[in-house]
């Protein structure tokens, strides 16, 4: 039997049909209600009560959240990646004929939030869209709707490069073409950290062409157009606050892929994904939300422009030379609210009176900020805008009360004296309420009832209340009974009824006029949006650079020299994060020398000795230098790097079914394929995910490839001590090691990196520190002693010859079995005949033209052969 729906439910179902991919928050009075599947899912996600509407088979699942506290529920759903369509009542229920008219006024998605309660203060909330066309690669457009910032970039490559760019961009939502191929759609769906939405239209609407006319590439315009159409569809209003699009050419900043950003823990830690423990946490001494967001952007996109870096360094130096003025400036900046997001909400028409008061207080600090900058010698760099905001500040000072309510419809927003008509209504309301207060006293005297009181509620209006015991004392004829309570009676009189009508009319007109006056003030403020956005950009930059000076002073950083050569020379270098979490003064400083013909350091030494820290230290120093910060070192001379590649740490990629070794090889492949002589490569323990000789052979081949083909500055750590012999034939490679000493059977890690190769790794000692059973570590020590007395095996027969992988095998693969055998038997030393399966794979290997394989194709072949052998 078909369900019989009420007119209201029919309205709900018609609207819901248009928003199948979102929760529909359907406004009913003081609640947002959800029905059917929305209700069931929302009740689970929000842990709220699931009820129902109707009876029996017609019962519809239902749940709801209060309108006034909806933000917290919305935030929880957004955090889980859901979309929410807000359906409001768009006509007054009192005047509605039939069902109240309702419309979806906006769609909230993870990438389109405007409400400051739903946003992280010091993080951008990016939405990204992309477009592609054949071999041209991908056009990427990105926008933070809450600030109005937009940028575009062009990347080359296939779907893997696209996915890396999206992941590295820190976006909350990605907009893909509706007709995206299924394979890429599936890969996008597997990604974590952002949701995927779809939009087909990609032309730039005419009213927004001015924002991107300076950019010629059609691919970028298509991506931007797709993003705009999605924003317009979800926001359902003009996007007047969007700023001119910024084009980021691929070579305009230091590139780091998602692996490098994660491994270096630039903005969050690998383990718990928190800011604490990251580079950002150490150097973020910004005091405004805007400055915090800008610093994060700088860290993720360091400069490659020597002049721009020098400009930032000069400001930091000026702030360091003027301590008192700098701290005075920072005190002023602490009084500045988030002008950038306030400007966006002003343009959006969603700013409230309390936020305009925040803007007023922020602008009142500008003259003092400008005066302080003049004292530091930076008056010409920023601002000089206080005069243009004088009228705006005066408007808000003369119109808005200092502590307005959040609601815009209940009055209390506008100061007395701003509008004559408003003052007249206020006088009427106040005089009427004074008359009411005096009425209570006069009625007590007239009736002799001391407990008589005058009250008010929304249902019955004003009333005179007396106890039942005293009701007989009221004179007949004048008092009309309005309500009977358990212990009291409520009455009205003709005079009270007349005065009530005047008061309520005045209050209603007062609230209506006050809202209209506020809307007019907000409209006048809207004319300043572009200027406010420029002001926000200036304040953000001075905040970041003043913070750089402050952290440099506190942590003893030095100004790096950015050289035009390729030399890297760091004296007394430190890891900026590690030094903050250990006892002050106990951090062991280290030098890094990659000058002259020293391009590559092969780092050996004990586990826990600090090899990975040493490698990350260099990369973080480079990032800090190229964002204009001072660096943790006694002296530092650095070139401009174009890219940083890292392969540090071990991690399976369970989501895509890739092993530790495959992940290791894929990340290494990126470095070998994309690095230039101006890149920095950090490779940690390459080859540990496979057998000893496979790993050693790969490590040597990779070192030789970097030496012969790329020539990039490289730090390569390894436990394969045999590789240290490469320094005899590769003239740009030097051996260094992390030192340790043994005292009375105890190993002391010195964390000092010195020239030369290490002779031991102390792995068994580290196992003891980890708490492995004594029986295990004792046995391991005995086996280690036995192995150390075995005859030395050659490991690098081809070390002194140029490597030709098509013709020459290394000794590691040609002269030994794949894995070291501790206890070989006579039977094990006999050559074994390959199985049928192995012969099949060998035949396929013989057919491969190695010289014409890309590294990725080679990895795919190896993966295919491994699967066949493991069947």
Swiss-Prot record:
Highest taxon, organism lineage: Bacteria
Gene Ontology CC annotation, any one: cytosol
Region (Disordered) residue spans: 791-840
Keyword Nucleotide-binding on entry: yes
Keyword DNA damage: yes
Record's keyword terms, sorted: ATP-binding, DNA damage, DNA repair, DNA-binding, Nucleotide-binding
InterPro entries: DNA_mismatch_repair_MutS, DNA_mismatch_repair_MutS-lik_N, DNA_mismatch_repair_MutS/MSH, DNA_mismatch_repair_MutS_C, DNA_mismatch_repair_MutS_clamp, DNA_mismatch_repair_MutS_core, DNA_mismatch_repair_MutS_N, DNA_mismatch_repair_MutS_sf
Record field: compositional bias (Basic and acidic residues): 827-840
Gene Ontology molecular-function annotations: ATP binding; ATP-dependent DNA damage sensor activity; damaged DNA binding; mismatched DNA binding
Residue sites binding ATP per the record: 605-612
Record-level GO BP terms: mismatch repair
Protein family according to the UniProt entry: Belongs to the DNA mismatch repair MutS family.
Free-text function comment from the UniProt entry: This protein is involved in the repair of mismatches in DNA. It is possible that it carries out the mismatch recognition step. This protein has a weak ATPase activity.
Protein name: DNA mismatch repair protein MutS
